[in-house]
Each structure stands twice: as C-alpha cells, then as structure tokens.
Amino acid sequence: MRTLSTNHYEIPTMFFRQIYEKGLAHASYMVGCQKSGTVAVIDAKRDVDTYIEIARQENLRITHVLETHIHADFLCGSRELAELTGAEMFLSDEGGAEWAYAFEHNGLRDGHSFMVGNIRFDVWHTPGHTPEHICFLVTDTPASSVPVMFFSGDFVFVGDVGRPDLLERAAGYSGTMVDGARQMFASLQRFRTLPDHIQIHPAHGAGSACGKSLGDVPHTTVGYEKLVNWALLIHNEELFVKTLLDGQPEPPQYFAMMKMLNKELRPLVSAVPKPVLLDPARFRALVDHGAQVVDTRDKSLSTNAAIPNSLWIANNNALSTWAGWMLDYNQEIIILGAKSQFDEICRRLMRIGLDRIVGYVDSTDVWTDAHKPLTHVPWMSVAQLRELRSAENIYVLDVRKATEFADGHVPGAHHIHAGYLRDHLAELPQDRHIAVMCAAGSRSTIACSLLLQHGFTNIYNITGGFDAWNAAGYEVE
C-alpha cells in the first residue's frame, strides 16, 4: 500500500508481518515502510532465509535488525541476518555492563527513537524478565502522531508476563529473581499508562517456557490486558512478586547456553545445514567416535526397534526444546528419520544452536546390516500397571512437570522431570521394574531412551501415560 495524500488524511504505508515458529512458540516480526522500501526485523530466529525471502517478495530492503533482550530459549539470528543483508543491529545498552552485548551494534537506551522510513520506533526500557530488556513503541507517522503498536518481547504476553527467574534458575545468577520480579512490577506501572487501543505484539505464545500461562492468540491490546492479565490485576507488590515466582515451569538446561551465545561472539551459520546420507561404515565410525544419534521417528517406531544408545526425540513441535534438554552441544549429531523431514529437523536444531549435524540415515539398516541387534522398550497399558504395580513391586517414575505431578499422579509414583533425569539416575532402583509415564507417552519415550543409554533394561513405557490412567477412573493422589 502506498501513501496517497488527500485533503483530509494520508493512507498508512506500514508493512507488518508476524513470523511464528510453533516449536518454540516464538514470534518474530517484520515492520517497515512501503514508501521507502525499508523494513526492520525484530527478534529474528536463526534460519533467517525466511525474512530474506519475504523482503524479496515484497520489494523491501532489510535495514534494521532489532532485539528486545538477550534471549534464553533460542539462538537469535540477528548477526546472521545483518551479515547477509548489510543491515545494522540496534540492541539494548541498558542493564549495566554485565548484560552488554560483546559485538558491534547501535546501542539503544530508554527514550531513544529512530526511523525506518516513515515508521517511528520509540525505545522503552522494561526490566523484569531481564535487566536489559527493551520494547518498541511504534508510530506510523504518515497516518498519525499517535503510536499504534508495542513490540513487547518477553515483557508482556497475552494473559501473562515474562518470568524473572531464568537468570537465577537457568543461568546461575544467584539472587536475581526477586529483584527481577520487583523490576517487573515497576515496569508494569509504566505499561498501564499506554492508551488502551495500542496493539501488543509479544515474542512468545502458548507453550513457551518463558512464562507460565501464556495465551494462545497471536496478539492483544493494552486495554484487553488491563482487563484480563493477572499481572495487571494485582496492585500489591509483595503479592505480585510471590504470584509471579510461584509455579513457573522448569527451565530447560540449554537456556544457559543460549544466554551465553546470544551475548558473545560466536561462529555464524548463514544457511540451514544440509546433512549427507551416511553409509553403514561411516555411520558406525562416527558413532564409535562419540556422535550422538537422534531418532526422530514416531515413538511407536523408536520404542519397538531402535539403534542402541540413540536418543528418541520425535520430530514434532517439541523437538527443539527436548533436543536442548538432552543433547550435548560438544558432540556431533546424526539424524535418524524420514528424509522428507530433514530440512525441518535441521532448522529446529539450529534454532537452539545445535549445529554439529554430520549426517543422516533414514532407517536402522545401517545397524542391522552389520548383524548388530536393535534395542526396544516394551509398552505397558495402564490396566496392566494397576494390576501389577503392587504384586510385581513396580517402581512408577513420573517424568512430567512438577506442577502436573502436583495436580495428580499415580499413588506412590516418584517424580523426576524428564529433563533432569540424567542428574538423578543414582536414585533409581536397579533391582525393580521401572514403569515410566508422562501425560501421554512422548516425554516418557525420551526418558526411556536415556535410561537405556545408562544401562537400565528393566523398564516399561506406559501407553497413554497419566491421561489414560486418569481417563480410566483409577485412583489418583
């Protein structure tokens, strides 16, 4: 749309596009000016070819690359995008030296403003989720002098706000989460001053680990959040701090790695990895030298016939998160799965910095052709579990989130979150059968593969998980 002057008004020229990545529930944005043909990208994902292609299709030039903060849940593609397009990076200089980016950029502070064509960006410092966090208040100046959009990053979500505990719980910065919660409370008081009509465009949606109750709609308004967002309905600071910190989900362990890589200089990966097909000899040589095999097939296939020591992480929207929980960033990666899915799998891995993909195989034949046996974990129904758990002295291991376990579990079950299982293997019995369950069977499959890696052979995967147990009407603690 081009600007057309009339006697009364000018038609807006703003370009806007949300790019949503379901796996990490991550929203990035392209915001620009069609008249000047320039556009900014906010909180870019790492596979930046998406933005370059959109800009090409829309006859736009990417000139500005923006970030709201140093992200913990994904590896930001700002540097790759700037390298490929010649755009300049505009990043926060708030929060103090400890939270400063270690590479060249245009530093932004509260009250700064800049233009992308005719589109004005005003910078707000909104500490709470992180000390350096900033937001962008956007005005389409040909249309009005009144701001219309607020790009809130991990500050305000639909129905929630960003968690302030990640620096302490995931990155090891002791004593930061209470201070962060108080900063969040103060930042929200300023947020309340915004007009109700302003659209809010956050960096995450439902399913993200960056909050505990994010809504599942793509955007919201200031007025709507004032009505329904729990964080804006609490006016007592002490109650707010307690409520914000209570019940936050377990942060994936890879978050600490993302914090470091997003802040420091690192090697750039400017294209999606394209792994090669491995022949049996090369596959076995890589495995012998420590390569980790990621079995991305459906759990019904991996649990029934798997390559020994492989990790079973199905290619679905949770792949990035569970790969971050389970894989070693210092080891090479081999993908086992359908060839048609490899581009998607590689994108999901590179988005969290897992770049050391050395090849792929599309079947277990590379193992069995050498007359090597496959491994498996038997399934057990909830009816069998109920019948056998007392008579057979079965140890029930529930690998769901702590909040899920607290809401209800099989009587006598033991809880260890699947992501922390590696750190608690010594607590598991070697002389009892272990029945592993999650909500429906996906996380328990991952946990079973980890247990097999560490020598546990007396394990069962519970079909349908706790959902099936509960649906059957069995007793619950």
What are these regions (language model features)?
Residues G37, R120, T130-E250:
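Metallo-beta-lactamase
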Residues Y9-R61, F136-V138, A143-G153, V158-G159:
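Conserved beta-strand hairpin/beta-sheet module of binuclear metal-dependent hydrolase folds
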